[in-house]
Amino acid sequence: MTSSDAPVVVGIDGSDGALNAARWAGAVAARFGAPLRIVHALPSVGRNLTQTAAAFTAAMMSYQRDMAEAFLKAADEAVRADNPELSVSTVSFNEPADQVLIDASSDARLVVLGGKKVTPAAALLLGSTALSVATRAACPVVAFRGETVAPGDGPVVVGVDDSPAAQAALESAFEFADRFGLAVNAVRSLSLAAPAETGVTIPLLIDWDGVESAELADLTETVDVHNKRHPGVDAKSFIEPDSPGKALLKHVADSGLVVVGSRGRNALAGVLLGSTSLNLLHHSPVPVMICRAAPQGDSDE
């Protein structure tokens, strides 16, 4: 993550889930010795309105500002009750929620998205906000899930492939686990298609035990690099012959956080990210952290 004075930012919408997210973010900020910034996005004001519409809009905006103040006050009080010594600030903006959080990520350690429970019907809407933030934010992003108001004692589960984003996910997972005294379970998905290096195209001709052993050895070696930086963390590696989303879901039931990587920064990247992350966002009982690889030049992946 980043320096100790960088804040943890949490976006709230006034729902019970958002209040829990604020408390969870407060617990994380307190453990990292970082300040907490609670933000709320108000709808933007319409333009070129008739006099009647303008009057109605002004009244509605006044009501929404009052509600925003109430949301922020409730979140501030709940967080301070949990962590009396924590530095907490609140702010609201008349901008789209995703842009508010993307801008806030520029100097943040972590951005937490609090809101209503995600359903399959809400996937596309959520994709336009949470995944927009995740693929464009300058820091890791957590989509809050579950009912907990602080990280528990379950392991941090992290999805690992051979991408730079997976390295970022591993480092974030180990740092989080180290701060909270948790274990790390690294999970790699194993495709059941014939690996190119075998030179054959028929899966039945593949020594899958050998493939799995090789993948496990490679994953363990990758995990060990990060484990050496955080020697107090107990780390285990797992190979799952399933899709990435399903492979991770096999391990999240008793975990406290699941961490995945985002491979890109553009609209297409959001779609690619969604196939795994949206599955987790629909079904994960715990918060989901999405990490981007460190920028490499100006080109999109």
Task: Report the location of each language-model feature.
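Structural beta-alpha unit
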Residues: 1-4, 17, 59-62, 77-111, ...
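Small/aliphatic-rich secondary-structure junction motif
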Residues: 2-58, 154-206, 227-230, 234-235, ...
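Short glycine/serine/threonine/alanine-rich loop segments
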Residues: 33-35, 86, 139, 182-183, ...
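General small-molecule cofactor/ligand-binding pocket signal
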Residues: 37-39, 89-93, 142, 185-187, ...
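A short acidic, glycine-rich active-site loop
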Residues: 57-70, 205-215
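Short beta-strand elements of ligand-binding domains
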Residues: 112-115, 141-146, 288-292
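Glycine-rich, Arg-bearing micro-motifs that act as flexible, cationic patches
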Residues: 113-132, 153, 257-283
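Short, structured interface segments
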Residues: 130-148
